[in-house]
Curated annotation (Swiss-Prot):
Ubiquitin is encoded by 5 different genes. Ubi1 and ubi2 are synthesized as a polyprotein with one copy of ubiquitin fused to ribosomal proteins eL40A and eL40B, respectively. Ubi3 and ubi5 are polyproteins with one copy of ubiquitin fused to ribosomal proteins eS31A and eS31B, respectively. Ubi4 is a polyprotein containing 5 exact head to tail repeats of ubiquitin. The keyword Lyase does not apply. It comes from Schizosaccharomyces pombe (strain 972 / ATCC 24843). There is a cross-link at residues 6, 11, 27, 29, 33, 48, 63 (Glycyl lysine isopeptide (Lys-Gly) (interchain with G-Cter in ubiquitin)). GO terms for cellular component: cytoplasm; cytosol; cytosolic large ribosomal subunit; nucleolus; nucleus. There is a cross-link at residue 76 (Glycyl lysine isopeptide (Gly-Lys) (interchain with K-? in acceptor proteins)). Residues 1-76 form the Ubiquitin-like domain. In the N-terminal section; belongs to the ubiquitin family. InterPro entries: Ribosomal_eL40_dom (IPR001975), Ribosomal_eL40_sf (IPR038587), Ubiquitin-like_dom (IPR000626), Ubiquitin-like_domsf (IPR029071), Ubiquitin_CS (IPR019954), Ubiquitin_dom (IPR019956), Ubiquitin_ubiquitin-like (IPR050158). This is Ubiquitin-ribosomal protein eL40B fusion protein. GO terms for molecular function: protein tag activity; structural constituent of ribosome; ubiquitin protein ligase binding. One of its GO terms (biological process) is ribosome biogenesis. The lineage of its organism: Eukaryota, Fungi, Dikarya, Ascomycota, Taphrinomycotina.
Amino acid sequence: MQIFVKTLTGKTITLEVESSDTIDNVKSKIQDKEGIPPDQQRLIFAGKQLEDGRTLSDYNIQKESTLHLVLRLRGGIIEPSLKALASKYNCEKQICRKCYARLPPRATNCRKKKCGHTNQLRPKKKLK
């Protein structure tokens, strides 16, 4: 049977499949046509994400059904050196005791007018 896969760019891919094919198998066919690795693919049908081990018939996908292909979000572990840099940039700040403005680490007075450029600053509290 024939099914359609619509990508986020609006492109529609036509695939020849059987109802007994697994979602893994469909993702492999998409990789053959589009070059997108299966581990980055997420298939959606009727508002549900399709699980790899299940078959098309499990989701009641019939001929000429349309699946939606979205890419898995990238993310994960931040490199330790970048984490230290981000921590230094975000955590080593001064806070105005009156208006709670975030100020550079070496600031002596607040930069805001609403607190009268006070010199009552404290270091930003550390995360636990």
